Amino acid sequence: MKKTILSTLCFLLVSCFMFFTDAGTRIVVLGSSTAAGAGVSDSNRAWVNQYRTYLQSIDPTNTVTNLAKGGYTTCAIMPTGTNPYNTGNHILEVDTERNITKALSLSPNAIIINMPTNDVSNGIPVATQMKHFATIIDLAKAAGVKVLITTSQPHNFGEKYDGPYSEEHQPD
């Protein structure tokens, strides 16, 4: 099943980028711990690295730049100059080295945003998260850059999690 998920993800993402005519597709990933590769004992098993390896097997000039960092929310990837966000418990700052402004400065063909749950975990309302996504997407579109927003996925596709599992929820 894990190979099926990875194959499907790769197929969909490659299909989205097949129309690029430039030699070498340039993709930037913005995200949190899953995209950064947390939870894997071998960084080559992180989904971004597997995706990079796959794309480069098709064309060695394809690049995938990973700007993800564990714990990040959509607040961290907002444009440079965006005011910090106050959750009521702490202030979330924009990271100018890992945000949409930095991503666009790399002249990508596409940006993948992988931010599964940290906004909710930090008490950021869904409406605010959606507003952040809209701002980021609008900036990318204005630059002619495609954006894909991914959902949650396993941290890796090659290691089994060691439980605990209920009887009806066993790994493949």
Regions found by a protein language model. Name each.
Residues 24-29, 34-131:
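Conserved SGNH/GDSL esterase-like catalytic core that processes O-acyl groups on lipids
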Residues 143-146:
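A short helix->loop->beta-strand "cap" motif at the edges of active sites that frequently abuts
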Residues 137-141:
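Surface-exposed amphipathic alpha-helices with a cationic face
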